[in-house]
Amino acid sequence: MPAESGKRFKPSKYVPVSAAAIFLVGATTLFFAFTCPGLSLNVSPAVPIYNAIMFLFVLANFSMATFMDPGIFPRAEEDEDKEDDFRAPLYKTVEIKGIQVRMKWCATCRFYRPPRCSHCSVCDNCVEEFDHHCPWVNNCIGRRNYRYFFLFLLSLTAHIMGVFGFGLLYVLYHIEELSGVRTAVTMAVMCVAGLFFIPVAGLTGFHVVLVARGRTTNEQVTGKFRGGVNPFTNGCCNNVSRVLCSSPAPRYLGRPKKEKTIVIRPPFLRPEVSDGQITVKIMDNGIQGELRRTKSKGSLEITESQSADAEPPPPPKPDLSRYTGLRTHLSLATNEDSSLLGKDSPPTPTMYKYRPGYSSSSTSAAMPHSSSAKLSRGDSLKEPTSIADSSRHPSYRSEPSLEPESFRSPTFGKSFHFDPLSSGSRSSSLKSAQGTGFELGQLQSIRSEGTTSTSYKSLANQTRNGSLSYDSLLTPSDSPDFESVQAGPEPDPPLGYTSPFLSARLAQQREAERHPRLLPTGPPHREPSPVRYDNLSRHIVASLQEREKLLRQSPPLAGREEEPGLGDSGIQSTPGSGHAPRTSSSSDDSKRSPLSKTPLGRPAVPRFGKPDGLRSRGLGSPEPGTTAPYLGRSISYSSQKAPSGVSETEEVALQPLLTPKDEVQLKTTYSKSNGQPKSIGSASPGPGQPPLSSPTRGGVKKVSGVGGTTYEISV
């Protein structure tokens, strides 16, 4: 009955309960009206009192069984096993007093029914300790109303028996008046009572047995414990006392309450604001993001203050004014992306003004790599930074100085500590610049083109600003010397010189232009060589003459191992020589100073006796007690003949060693395997180590170097 509110009205389900109530009340009323007055006079006045009490007890239990909540479980709003991805199993097993009891999944109420609970098909609810659905009371009989139903049956049976018995007694007292009205009504009531006594008495007896055994009608009918032990029984007396004397079970459904309407008078009346007056835009996080005022300013001050106090929604982009560190990284990333992907890159100084201080000068802040041939060279060349200014400040992109403090020029800035184990990553073009004595502009161009610092800061710079790509090795532009050198006209490269880090296309173009000039004929008329030795002292020229004498006297060695001094003889063999294993050395690598940064157009003049162009040793003149690092070639390349993997060498005629102005012009040979010069001999040989040479032909001395490198020296 209580569960029927809110559902569709079904008149048919009220027919049984209405008939039962009519028969009960009607028969009892007739009994009291026609039979009880005669019995009170003939038998006892207590007979009507007894029947009245019994009738009230029956009526009370009937009402309680009809209108009381049987113990309905509320339906689950969501599945209990919603965290499971699979469908809930039909049964779950629990153990009660050592006996396994199954709990069935209720698809309607969406939970597992507790033990002794069942879903009523008429009420469409799960009822705790479901017994049966009684149509005569129009309600399910469960844990909460079973007591009243059982008492109703007992009292009704007793009442029927009382009505039938006292009616029969009245008929026997008035057997002569069977045709009378009172006797006829009494006989009719007896027929009704007798008619209902058989089913009611049978039902009462059945429930008495169930209560004594501790079972329900559902368990008895379905035969759940027919062949086993009932875990819910506590004995006959305990079972009866539990049904009749136990406290009522709690109610699981809340009682429906009517909504109370309270009228508030003007002192407590809030101003009504319609949707047309205020437009509120709710963000995803519930914050009021936009208000449009159409009324007065004061009506929205409270709302605005509340929205201002609340935490604002996360912006699509970070607040650069609040997060300084994040602003720095975002500025760097944005500028780098625009400089790499855009056709016309922005000036690099604007990108690096927020960079953390690896270097104190802005001249060292340039892009570490490039994705095209353009890069941002045009912007970087516009910087009015001189070479001398850039040399005063330490730069984490500059080449680490390998010269001791005593041989260091005061104009040079401080460099990083040299690690001999990481010297394999030094650029070979820097050694070429020091070995051949080019003009300062070309030296700095070579240096900026091929310099890769071994310092961890340089590596951190490359990995922080971009990946260490192959293009960044081919055309680097991160050196401040590059900017200063490119500001002036670029001089022609020396004959036979090829940068090891040029692209393949540019190398082929330069090589095609260079081949006609590499003939072993006399030197053509040309501009003064960029390699000038105007300031050479006399004793250096004398040492060159001594070397010529030794070259004439010493026989060539056929299978000699690679000269240790070759590592410092000019330019290293291959760009990949840095990947070859290198040994720590204490040779001229530790004594060589960085490139002198003199103005363009002036020859590089060394401060000490030996010029930079001749400071490297020759093939046969390593310093005693020193060992230079290995090159990227194996010992098998040290024979006179070039190996099969290497192309034929280009022979370049050396200029006369002595000129009227003591000018020494050197031309080195280059291998086509990598386009780099092998070695340039410039120092006197050490004792016990004869140089590599070949027989003289027609006034020209042919000297064989390691790996198939040959020299022709005019005598």
Curated annotation (Swiss-Prot):
PTM sites of type Phosphoserine: 247, 296, 299, 345, 380, 398, 406, 409, 415, 425, 429, 432, 529, 554, 621, 684, 694
Comp. bias regions, Polar residues: 442-478, 666-677
Enzyme class: transferase
Catalytic activity: L-cysteinyl-[protein] + hexadecanoyl-CoA = S-hexadecanoyl-L-cysteinyl-[protein] + CoA
Cellular localisation: Cell membrane
Residue numbers on the Cytoplasmic membrane side: 1-13, 74-148, 213-715
Modified residues (Phosphotyrosine): 91
Disruption phenotype: Deletion mutant mice are born at half the expected rate, and survivors show a marked deficit in contextual fear conditioning, an indicator of defective hippocampal-dependent learning. Loss of ZDHHC5 in oligodendrocytes inhibits myelination and reduces the expression levels of myelin-related and anti-apoptosis genes.
Residues annotated as domain DHHC: 104-154
Single GO MF annotation: protein-cysteine S-palmitoyltransferase activity
Membrane topology: Multi-pass membrane protein
UniProt topological domain (Extracellular) ranges: 35-52, 170-191
Domain notes: The DHHC domain is required for palmitoyltransferase activity.
Family that this chain belongs to: Belongs to the DHHC palmitoyltransferase family. ERF2/ZDHHC9 subfamily.
Name of the protein: Palmitoyltransferase ZDHHC5
The organism of origin for this protein: Mus musculus (Mouse)
Lineage start: Eukaryota, Metazoa, Chordata, Craniata, Vertebrata
